[in-house]
């Protein structure tokens, strides 16, 4: 009879411990709590009633010169600001700058494939040219070009802005990462065009 009492005490402690774990309140991380309060996220993880997402529509024309392994591109991009915020800067992403001299990369590339990266020739915002040599207007960090907008070109909520760009890119000859050359007539082209972080 005496051996049953410690067993029931131990069983009771285990029962209380398991129930306290099962019914304990899990603390909601601050960033998620803020999203719940703003209505951009629901408690079940789905988008909330105030959820928004920016997006871009691209019209891309590319000339490929196989003998030079060169791409010459023109893009018209309509950027759609669906956020409640006024945007005073925007980021253009150059995925292929992983072959640019000095770019950090997580893999080895053939030294002869390292080049100047995506060469941005022209950038227009609503038809107004951006001085690409002015680092206060367009400053590249890694594979991102940070574009600071003049107040007359701020992107207002629920509005669209037209960006036009011209660029050039050399396809690597020996390193086939995201793109590459297989022989004189076979190429792999992926992530070739500059795009916005939406």
Regions found by a protein language model. Name each.
Residues 1-2, 10-11, 147:
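Generic low-polarity alpha-helical segments
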Residues 1-6, 114:
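Positively charged n-region of N-terminal signal peptides that target proteins for export
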Residues 7-8, 47:
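Generic hydrophobic alpha-helical membrane-segment signal
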Residues 9-19:
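Bacterial N-terminal signal peptides
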Residues 24-198:
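Acidic/His-enriched low-complexity segments
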């Amino acid at each position: 009879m005496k051996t049953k009492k410690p067993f029931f005490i131990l069983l009771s402690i285990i029962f209380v411990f398991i129930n306290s774990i099962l019914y304990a309140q899990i603390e909601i991380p601050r960033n998620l709590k803020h999203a719940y309060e703003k209505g951009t996220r629901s408690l079940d993880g789905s988008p909330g009633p105030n959820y928004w997402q920016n997006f871009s529509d691209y019209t891309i024309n590319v000339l490929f010169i196989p003998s030079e392994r060169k791409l010459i591109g023109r893009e018209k991009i309509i950027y759609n600001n669906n956020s409640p915020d006024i945007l005073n800067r925007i980021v253009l992403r150059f995925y292929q700058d992983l072959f640019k001299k000095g770019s950090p990369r997580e893999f080895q590339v053939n030294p002869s494939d390292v080049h100047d990266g995506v060469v941005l020739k022209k950038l227009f915002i609503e038809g107004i040219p951006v001085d690409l040599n002015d680092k206060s207007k367009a400053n590249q960090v890694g594979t991102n070009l940070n574009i600071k907008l003049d107040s007359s070109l701020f992107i207002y909520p629920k509005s669209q802005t037209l960006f036009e760009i011209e660029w050039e890119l050399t396809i690597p000859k020996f390193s086939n990462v995201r793109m590459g050359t297989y022989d004189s007539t076979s190429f792999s082209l992926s992530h070739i065009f500059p795009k916005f972080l939406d």
